[in-house]
Every structure is written in C-alpha cells, then in structure tokens.
Regions:
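Short sequence/structural segments immediately N-terminal
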Residues: 1-182
Length: 182
C-alpha cells in the first residue's frame, strides 16, 4: 500500500512463508511437529504474536508473556483468574512452562508424551499421590480410559486445595468409585 493510504499492509509472501525466508530452520521444525498452533498456521502466521521488525518484549513479542495468550484464550484466562487455587506457573503467567506457543507433538500443545509425563517433570508422583496412574490404572467408569493426573486434579486452577476436583477425599473418590458412596 502507498504511504498514507487506507489500504491494508501487504507482504510479498503470506503468513509464516515470509518469516521462513530468514528463519527456515525454526519454521520447518515447527511445522514438522504433530500439532501446530493455529496462530502459526493461519494467514497472518507469526505476526499474530510477534512484531515483524521490532517489539518491546523478548523474542519480538508484541505483548509480554501470558498477555499474548490472553488475546485468543480469554475464556481460559477468565476461569483461571476466578479460581481461588491456581497452578504456580499459571498464576505467574508462564503458559509456556507447560504449553509450546508454536507446535508440539503432544495434546494441548505440550512437548511431552503425555499429560502425566508433563506433570511428573515438576511433581514427584511417588510423593504426591496415593492412587496409581498410567497405562495399568484403568478408569472404573470407562475401561478404555486410564487414570491420570487430570482424573483428580485440574490443570490450571480450581476451587479446592491441590487443585482437586472435589472438596473432600470422599467426594473425590466416589466420582469414580460409586460403590463407596454413602
């Protein structure tokens, strides 16, 4: 567009293709992952979060830390803000402690083989749990599911101590083990 015109800014190449000219290794590694964040893959590509030439924040981010995430994930951020108990990385605005902002091979853009593995990268399962989890721990509600960290805990924050789904152990256990309900 001509200087001073109302026409939108345009580039020689769309989205991440423009960035690939100089950052081919990073763009190619990102696109090779199993799950690519929509913000990378859409028509604006990298400039959804990064300034093309300069920005006030590290890594040319147009907004600091979690503020970049808030633009598109406002509903999640609102739930987190309302939760009385928050996961420490979430409370500090460090979304990238668990989620990759660009792409990952794991669900929910986590770069771990499973949610349990992600949790165990900071939390010692043997110290923090009395319940088995993993491939051998079958969910009593559905034989096709396995018990994992999120069976009892919320990921970002919640209403109860230790981010549990229920206020008491009895309530928590009887969510799956109905035979123990009073």
């Amino acid at each position: 567009a001509a200087p001073g015109s109302a026409a939108p800014f345009s580039t020689l190449r769309p989205g991440y293709e423009l960035c690939r000219n100089c950052h081919a290794d990073m763009v190619d590694a990102t696109l090779a992952k199993g799950r690519v964040h929509w913000a990378v893959a859409d028509k604006k590509g990298c400039v959804n979060c990064h300034g093309p030439h300069a920005a006030k924040h590290d890594k040319l981010l147009t907004k600091a830390g979690a503020e970049s995430c808030r633009d598109c994930h406002a509903d999640t951020m609102a739930r987190i803000a309302a939760a009385p108990v928050k996961h420490k990385p979430v409370d500090s605005g460090a979304c990238s402690a668990c989620h990759s902002p660009h792409a990952a091979n794991g669900v929910h853009l986590i770069d771990q083989p499973s949610i349990n593995t992600l949790c165990e990268s900071c939390h010692d399962y043997q110290t923090h749990s009395a319940h088995p989890i993993g491939d051998k721990a079958v969910d009593p509600r559905n034989k096709n599911l396995r018990v994992g960290c999120l069976s009892c805990h919320t990921a970002h924050g919640g209403d109860f101590k230790w981010m549990l789904h229920s206020a008491t152990n009895i309530e928590l256990c009887t969510r799956c083990h109905k035979q123990f309900a009073r």
